[in-house]
Swiss-Prot record:
InterPro entries: Acylphosphatase, Acylphosphatase-like_dom, Acylphosphatase-like_dom_sf, Acylphosphatase_CS. Pfam families: Acylphosphatase (PF00708). The active site is at R21, N39. The gene is acyP. This is Acylphosphatase. SUPFAM superfamilies: Acylphosphatase/BLUF domain-like (SSF54975). Residues 6-93 form the Acylphosphatase-like domain. The lineage of its organism: Bacteria, Bacillati, Chloroflexota, Chloroflexia, Chloroflexales.
Length: 93
């Protein structure tokens, strides 16, 4: 059985208007992680990544840099119990 993980992540810095959500979706699909990503009104980006632990860890690591125009200042990671509810990866508008 696979070792599953779920990370609930909040990314701070210049992370809106820099293609962060689309880049996160593309990378999540590449590494095989399910979940979602959205902008928050306070300027942060929030995301949930669920899947095989090694793939979720790759996504969390990616959040510390993000796409080339992003300037990540902080990443708050909350590890949660996997729910199995996520199907695919989507941008929430």
């Amino acid at each position: 059985m696979m070792d599953m993980a779920r990370a609930h992540v909040f990314i701070s810095g210049r992370v809106q208007g820099v293609n962060f959500r689309a880049s996160a979706r593309n990378y999540a699909r590449e590494v095989g992680v399910s979940g979602w990503v959205r902008n928050l009104e306070d300027g942060r980006v929030e995301a949930v990544f669920e899947g095989e632990r090694s793939a979720v860890q790759k996504m969390v690591s990616w959040c510390y840099s993000g796409p080339s125009h992003a300037r990540v200042e902080a990443v708050d990671v909350r590890w949660e119990k996997p729910t199995g509810e996520e199907r695919g990866f989507s941008i929430i508008w």
